């Protein structure tokens, strides 16, 4: 890729949901002359080919290979990084490599490649927020990775972005089964029933449309990275209680819906080892009064501000510059 003096390369690590959304948002920019690059272990995968067809430069590199990564990040002005907590490698017991190890390797390559700006998809520290009561591995590994990046002293700016509960997870049948069939399968009484542990007392659950909003939020950060340096951004499109979630589905589809809480967070995903870390998130929100984002409040104003800043750069206005509500999303996908 030939880079002119006014062009800036933004590289996303991966081609999955978050990285793909960020790449698409940046490609839509009409003012900043961003060039978008994506790093993939499998450049021939469907997701990689899709991004390549849109104009993204897809570069092959292994996240564990420092030299490959450094070459892949060459000439990069800013990077967006999200690592996959559900990678089977990180679910193994014992002393195997951790998600922090991967994050550290990526950060070391960013430093070696002299990348100036970093947006890192992460969480607050479960240990700090619960005063040592809970250690939730995915939260802690991502938190420690961003902390390490800041401690290098290398980056001009760093920003953490905390993704809320994906709207798109409700499209997955396996996920629906875990939550009692919600939002597609009626229970024995004919209700679409959302079954999940109680959340917390003070703040409500938050949700984000990865495909419609998340990429624009990161785009907004990268338009003014200095304004977001050292901050953490709650990436939420909508906020509501679980009772309101069920009512929203009913309003959108006309199908009677309800929320029935599970007796304990320990009952969530019982017998499914892959959900052991996920169930602890309910323990976390119960321990923190519903503060899923930990050190920042649950709200959508910040996300809307970023969305509108990105929309301006993309030449969009009206409803395209607004966050997608859960009700609108339910209507589109289930009505």
Curated annotation (Swiss-Prot):
Presence of keyword Oxidoreductase: yes
The family this protein is said to belong to: Belongs to the NmrA-type oxidoreductase family.
Stored InterPro entries: NAD(P)-bd_dom_sf, NmrA-like, NmrA-like_oxidored
Name under which the protein is recorded: NmrA-like family domain-containing oxidoreductase lnbB
Binding residue positions for NADP(+): 14-18, 41-45, 62-63, 83-85, 142, 166-169
Pathway: Secondary metabolite biosynthesis
GO cellular component, one term: nucleus
One matching Pfam family: NmrA
Encoding gene per record: lnaB
EC id: 1.-.-.-
Highest taxon of the lineage: Eukaryota
Alphabetized UniProt keyword annotations: NADP, Oxidoreductase
Organism: Aspergillus flavus (strain ATCC 200026 / FGSC A1120 / IAM 13836 / NRRL 3357 / JCM 12722 / SRRC 167)
Purpose: NmrA-like family domain-containing oxidoreductase; part of the lnb gene cluster that mediates the biosynthesis of diastereomeric piperazines. Lna and lnb clusters encode sets of enzymes that produce overlapping sets of previously undescribed metabolites such as piperazinomycin-like metabolites or morpholine. The lna and lnb biosynthetic pathways appear to be part of a signaling network that controls the formation of sclerotia, a resilient overwintering structure. One primary function of the non-canonical nonribosomal peptide synthetases lnaA and lnbA consists in the reduction of L-tyrosine.
Principal EC category: oxidoreductase
């Amino acid at each position: 890729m030939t880079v002119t003096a006014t062009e800036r390369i933004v590289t996303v690590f991966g081609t999955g949901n978050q990285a793909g959304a960020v790449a698409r948002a940046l490609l839509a920019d009409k003012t900043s002359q961003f060039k978008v690059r994506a790093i993939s272990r499998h450049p021939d995968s469907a997701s990689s080919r899709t991004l390549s067809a849109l104009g993204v430069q897809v570069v092959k590199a292994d996240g564990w290979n420092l030299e490959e990564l450094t070459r892949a990040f060459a000439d990069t002005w800013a990077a967006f990084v999200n690592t996959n907590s559900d990678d089977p490698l990180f679910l193994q017991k014992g002393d195997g490599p951790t998600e922090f190890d991967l994050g550290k390797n990526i950060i070391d390559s960013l430093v070696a490649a002299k990348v100036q700006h970093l947006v890192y998809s992460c969480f607050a520290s479960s240990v700090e927020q619960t005063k040592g009561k809970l250690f939730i591995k995915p939260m802690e590994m991502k938190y420690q990775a961003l902390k390490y990046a800041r401690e290098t002293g290398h980056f001009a700016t760093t920003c953490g972005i905390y993704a809320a509960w994906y709207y798109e997870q409700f499209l997955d049948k396996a996920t629906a089964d875990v939550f009692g069939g919600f939002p597609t399968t009626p229970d024995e009484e004919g209700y679409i029933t959302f079954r999940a542990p109680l959340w917390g007392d003070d703040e409500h659950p938050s949700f984000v449309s990865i495909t419609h909003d998340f990429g624009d939020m990161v785009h907004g950060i990268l338009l003014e990275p200095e304004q977001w340096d050292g901050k953490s951004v709650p990436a939420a499109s909508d906020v509501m209680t679980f009772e309101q979630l069920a009512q929203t589905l009913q309003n959108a589809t006309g199908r009677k819906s309800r929320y029935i809480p599970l007796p304990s967070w320990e009952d969530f995903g019982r017998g499914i080892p892959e959900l052991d870390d996920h169930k602890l998130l309910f323990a976390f929100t119960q321990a923190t009064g519903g503060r899923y984002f930990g050190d920042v409040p649950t709200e959508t104003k910040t996300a809307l501000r970023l969305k509108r800043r990105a929309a301006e750069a993309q030449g969009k206005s009206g409803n395209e510059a607004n966050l997608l509500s859960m009700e609108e999303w339910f209507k589109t996908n289930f009505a």
